[in-house]
Amino acid sequence: MEGHIHHITPRNITASILQQKVAVQGIITKSSQIRPLLQTAVQFCPLDYSTHARDLSHADVMVKLSSKTPDGKPLELEPGLSTYKDFQTLVVQEMPESAPTGQMPRSVIVILLDQLVDKGKPGDRVIINGTLKALAGPNHSSTFKVVLEAENINTLQSEGPELTEIDKENIKKVMKEENPINLLSKSIAPSIYGHSDVKKAILLMLVGATPKIRLRSRVRGDIHVMLCGDPSTAKSQLLRYVMSIAPLAVSTNGRGATGVGLTAAVVNDPDTNQRTLEAGAMVLADRGIVCVDEFDKMSIEDRAAMHEVMEQQTVTVQKAGIHTALNARCSILAAANPSNGNYDVKKSPMENLYFPESLLSRFDLIFIILDSSTEELDRRLSQHVLKMHRHFDALTEQRGDDEVNVLALVDAEREKIGDAPVYQDTSLYEGEKLFTNKFIKKYVTYARNLPTPSLSESASETIADAYVKLRENERLKRIKHNFKIKTLPITARALDSLIRLAEAHARIRGSDTIDEIDAQVAVQLIFYAHFDENWEGNITTDIARKVREYLTNELIAECKDVIQFDDILSICGIDKPTLMKILPQLSFGYDEDEEFVYKQN
């Protein structure tokens, strides 16, 4: 096509551009079945036995046939003598990440003819060239319906913002740093105190790995992460932050989400009364991230609908005569609260969440986030929050004619193309350089598009040793706790998780090989998520907190004289060497020979 073409989204469609050539960018949310459309209509008059042929190849697709001749004689359609062409309708909606906050995404009906039918399916991101036309509404209403008569369809292959040469140079400089994941993770939700390992996992999830074909079976490359724990531990805030830095993200809430709303639904088209296929959130987020808050509020049946998406990354539809499979190649970031309010460390994650093991094993990482309380930690947290309030940027919302939606402005900023500023201009974190959200988004986009790194021999050995140790740790804990394990299940999927995490870290470094350092980062996150310790057996603050809380409750609240080592090891799920590393840090006395702990005067 030649001449000026308006490049628009469904939100920009107005009466001023009707009957003009446009290029509409959006995502296909609904597709109809293919039906025949009259191309040459042959009509028969039963009074004089005459036939009348009418060429409709250049007429509007919704034109109505006349039922009478010019002199008033009746006409009947002869279907056998008429000719037809293929006809299909799509609904194209503006991109979820570009819709202004607080407003419904807008859509436009697209008409496909002949060779264009079946060129797009729900979930595809497309640019459709065609002509905007107005169709009369029912009952000769003065309002019209806008449709786009397609002339060409291009499927978008790349996601994320456009990178300039300066952006690429800045990204390569960061990749050459000694430990880029530490630099980047500090810039992820900097207003949230702590959770360094969780932020690293989120960064690895955003970058992801490459799906692979292994013995004719597809192995996913997307990383799934769940955040579970006590209320007020910033789980939802982390999800909201991911929405702002992910190149493509769709948000949903478990309280109102249904299985078909997350996957796909077969609905009736009100105009044609035909069955149409409508894409759900996971199909719309193909090659992106799905953030599911209140994951524990979903029903068992709705959560079961996610099993296929999380492992096979497709949505199979077998309803109302429609048999198809839609792509849902997305990562899942879920946040859940324990069923009893606060997380009970004496119970397993399955008992705390009432989730089946088949679902939990599909997550690569499940972080148990507890509301830890020590005097030092509380003081640091309060200082961090107070510093934020002293240095916050005031956002003024004006009402009336000049009303400004601050969040909508933030979303609109995503669409701007240009050099991204590298560092934030803030006085909140003195002495630290934090990357801007725009730069992190471009960094993630660049890393995702790098060639697939190859697995080195040293990394393979590290991953294999770690997997064996994971299984051994789980077996020992099952025996120690009479097969009532307090940690997450270790299945063969954990081995694939280690490989995916290591590959994502290699992409962050810009390396063409997965080295031992990448494997060590992956192993560290897996061990921290499963056992609250690193793979070398070092003690984490959460383990020490568990022991401190148990001893405080038994010796002070329950007024017991002594606590035997065996009771501590059984309740806290640790071994004696670990306990002996923790006890010197606590304000309790202990006798290593007699193996008991007592309250000091």
Swiss-Prot record:
Keyword list, A-Z: ATP-binding, Cell cycle, Chromosome, DNA replication, DNA-binding, Helicase, Hydrolase, Nucleotide-binding, Nucleus
Subunit structure: Component of the MCM2-7 complex.
Binding-site residues for ATP, renumbered to this chain: 229-236
Catalysis performed (reactions): ATP + H2O = ADP + phosphate + H(+)
Descriptive protein name: DNA replication licensing factor MCM3
GO BP term, example: mitotic DNA replication initiation
Span of the signal peptide: none
Extent of motif Arginine finger: 361-364
UniProt key word Phosphoprotein: no
First-listed, main subcellular location of the protein, grouped into a coarse class: nucleus
Top-tier EC class: hydrolase
Cited InterPro entries: AAA+_ATPase (IPR003593), MCM (IPR031327), Mcm3 (IPR008046), MCM_CS (IPR018525), MCM_dom (IPR001208), MCM_lid (IPR041562), MCM_OB (IPR033762), NA-bd_OB-fold (IPR012340)
Listed GO MF terms: ATP binding; ATP hydrolysis activity; helicase activity; single-stranded DNA binding
Domain of life of the native organism: Eukaryota
Biological function: Acts as a component of the MCM2-7 complex (MCM complex) which is the replicative helicase essential for DNA replication initiation and elongation in eukaryotic cells. Required for DNA replication and cell proliferation. The active ATPase sites in the MCM2-7 ring are formed through the interaction surfaces of two neighboring subunits such that a critical structure of a conserved arginine finger motif is provided in trans relative to the ATP-binding site of the Walker A box of the adjacent subunit.
Family label: Belongs to the MCM family.
EC number: 3.6.4.12
Keyword Cell cycle found: yes
Pfam assignment, any one: MCM
Domain MCM: 180-386
Gene3D superfamilies noted in UniProt: 2.20.28.10, Nucleic acid-binding proteins, P-loop containing nucleotide triphosphate hydrolases
Cellular component, GO, one term: MCM complex
CDD domains listed in its UniProt record: MCM3
Protein localization: Nucleus; Chromosome; Nucleus, Nucleoplasm
